[in-house]
Amino acid sequence: MLLIGVAGTELSAQERDWLQHDAVAGVVLFKRNFASRTQVAELSAAIRAAAPRPVLVCVDQEGGRVQRFREGFSALAPLQSFGAQYAHDPESALAAARAHAQLMASEVRASGVDLSFAPVVDLGRGNRAIGDRAFSDDPQIVATFTRAYVQALHGAGMAATLKHFPGHGTVLEDTHVDHASDPRPLEVLQAEDLVPFVAGIEAGADAVMMAHVVYPQVAPEPAGYSQRWIEQILRGQMGFCGVVFSDDIGMAASFSAGGVAGRVHAHLDAGCDVVLVCHPELVAESLQAVQGRSLNTAALIGLIGRGALGWDGLLAGTDASFTTPPSAHFGTTA
């Protein structure tokens, strides 16, 4: 299955045709697709109306610098702010993170979008792309926040997606623009980077997004292209039974598999259920690549947002005392 990107704030005729394709699982939205709360709700409805089957509408609404919907939405703090707060007041930090998850999920769901790819559970150890998107550099602290965040997302009717497996935070390179390799052995990764993923899976996380990072002591290819990582470790050893997303095939670190078709096939052959094709100019070739493939469609139904939510009532279950914690001002509108 493919999760595709579209060009603007309304669907074109070609994009409506794409949504008719059996291989299209849904659409991932970006800043380019957003003008207002009303507009994004209308776009979400148009996406669903164009598809002959239930589809996902997704976004990255993590908070901080990765927040695609801003005007009319709460200004969400980066996750690192909760880790900083945890050092001197663990309970209030966890409460604030739960409120952050509930608020984010409620606003996204009230806009007709099923899920935000969250939470980031990478360790915050200097990666250029991760930075303040991570809770902490400490695996146990990240694991604690992961459990709380997953549970809060579920409470707001949103599926939880752990990213970026098996851990993107320790390499320096940004895989959007460069290849990245982590030389550590599996035993070290299991003791550090995998700890939050274990916690999230135990908490009932619904999906995992793969990293485009190579871990040469474990497998020679990027994790998203690796049966060793997906089938043997994530599913076999860690017992994960949910949906596996690739990261975007337009990122530089994905180019090791060759052209667009090669990247799509490499992800699906490795065990990914859904391949992210975020750049509209790559969609047609990606759809051609999956012709004739057997695709996992049933697994995606569980990711569709649960329960209809109206914007006016979205904060009904949120404790007002957590809307503006001292280290995380996410209760104001952008």
From Swiss-Prot:
Main location: cytoplasm
Reaction(s) this enzyme catalyzes, per UniProt: Hydrolysis of terminal non-reducing N-acetyl-D-hexosamine residues in N-acetyl-beta-D-hexosaminides
GO terms for MF: beta-N-acetylhexosaminidase activity
Keyword Cytoplasm in record: yes
Domain of life of the organism encoding this protein: Bacteria
Annotated metabolic or biological route of this protein: Cell wall biogenesis; peptidoglycan recycling
Alphabetized UniProt keyword annotations: Cell cycle, Cell division, Cell shape, Cell wall biogenesis/degradation, Cytoplasm, Glycosidase, Hydrolase, Peptidoglycan synthesis
Residues annotated as the enzyme's active site: 176 (proton donor/acceptor), 247 (nucleophile)
Biological-process GO terms, alphabetical: carbohydrate metabolic process; cell division; cell wall organization; peptidoglycan biosynthetic process; peptidoglycan turnover; regulation of cell shape
Enzyme class: hydrolase
EC number(s) given by UniProt: 3.2.1.52
Function per UniProt: Plays a role in peptidoglycan recycling by cleaving the terminal beta-1,4-linked N-acetylglucosamine (GlcNAc) from peptide-linked peptidoglycan fragments, giving rise to free GlcNAc, anhydro-N-acetylmuramic acid and anhydro-N-acetylmuramic acid-linked peptides.
PANTHER family registered for this protein in UniProt: BETA-HEXOSAMINIDASE, BETA-HEXOSAMINIDASE-RELATED
Family per similarity comment: Belongs to the glycosyl hydrolase 3 family. NagZ subfamily.
Protein name as annotated: Beta-hexosaminidase
Organism in which the protein naturally occurs: Xanthomonas euvesicatoria pv. vesicatoria (strain 85-10) (Xanthomonas campestris pv. vesicatoria)
Gene name of the encoded protein: nagZ
